[in-house]
From Swiss-Prot:
Lineage: Bacteria, Pseudomonadati, Pseudomonadota, Alphaproteobacteria, Sphingomonadales
Pfam families linked to this entry: PAP2
InterPro entries (alphabetical): Acid_Pase_classA_bac (IPR001011), Acid_Pase_classA_bac_CS (IPR018296), P_Acid_Pase_2/haloperoxi_sf (IPR036938), P_Acid_Pase_2/haloperoxidase (IPR000326)
Family: Belongs to the class A bacterial acid phosphatase family.
Signal recorded as keyword: yes
Protein known as: Acid phosphatase
CDD domains reported in the protein's UniProt record: PAP2_acid_phosphatase
GO MF annotation terms: acid phosphatase activity
Cofactor(s) listed in the protein's UniProt record: Mg(2+); Zn(2+)
């Protein structure tokens, strides 16, 4: 179990890409952006995210300890879940939330939901990239021989900034959207969003503090998007679509749900 300082947990809870590259994950996995494919409201993470921990600080010591201790999870069921969570294709991300939502989330059957999430993530793209480039933090596995759950992406990830975690920003953004759309499953959805972020720590792709910043950034982005009339309209369309789909949706795979529950 990953030990989390209580005050950091509270920040993440109250505040609330990148297996082969941020640009590839967002643009390729959500199709090419067009002027009308994003929303107009977004937040500036450089104004509200604290800088990453400095070398020799207690927070960096906690980051180091967490990274080293979680390397022991290689080969475990939790490691496999972290590998699964690294896939940012929209169909895969929504599948990750199926158990928590109590229904399969098939993008082919939920076009309004798919459009909503694609536009939201495209809107976040520049903010995530700007924050990463601003701090250009080295990832925890760089200059080590420690394993990560997506070894094929090791070289590419090592060239990208670690802070904040783009995967976590995306995962928590999706969790916030789904929790609002399916309020009777909100707690489970948010819990799955927290697990999605923790997967980046388990994977070894991010420091603990990168993930905490990702939760905060996602919360800022989604809060700002609510100021966009198009976003609110798309939310309502997705809400009605989900309400209708729930009457005939298939239930998620029971084995997968049990694996996710074991990660809690």
């Amino acid at each position: 179990m990953i030990k989390v300082p209580r005050f950091i947990c509270m920040i993440a809870l109250t505040s609330g890409i990148l297996a082969s590259g941020l640009s590839q994950s967002v643009s390729a996995h959500t199709e090419k952006s067009e002027p009308s494919s994003t929303y107009h409201f977004h937040s500036d993470p450089l104004l509200y995210l604290a800088p990453p921990p400095t070398s020799g600080s207690p927070l960096q010591a906690h980051d180091d300890q967490t990274f080293n201790s979680t390397r022991q999870l290689k080969g475990s069921t939790r490691w496999a879940l972290a590998t699964q969570d690294a896939d940012l294709h929209l169909a895969s991300v929504l599948k990750d939330y199926a158990c928590a939502a109590g229904m399969n989330l098939d993008i082919a059957q939920l076009p309004h939901l798919a459009n909503l999430i694609k536009r939201a993530l495209r809107t976040e793209y520049d903010d995530i990239g700007r924050a990463k480039n601003n701090w250009n933090r080295k990832r925890p596995f760089v200059d080590t021989d420690q394993p990560i759950c997506t070894e094929k992406d090791r070289e590419g990830l090592g060239k990208q900034g670690s802070y904040p975690s783009g995967h976590t920003t995306i995962g928590w953004s999706v969790a916030l959207i789904l929790a609002e759309l399916i309020p009777d499953h909100a707690a489970n959805i948010l819990q799955r969003g927290q697990i999605f972020g923790t997967s980046r720590i388990v994977c070894g792709a991010h420091w603990f503090s990168d993930v905490q910043a990702g939760y905060i950034m996602a919360s800022g982005e989604i809060a700002a998007l609510h100021g966009d009339a198009d976003f609110r309209r798309d939310m309502e369309l997705a809400r009605k679509e989900l309400e209708k789909a729930r009457t005939s949706a298939h239930t998620p795979d029971d084995l997968l749900c049990k694996i996710e529950q074991s990660a809690r």
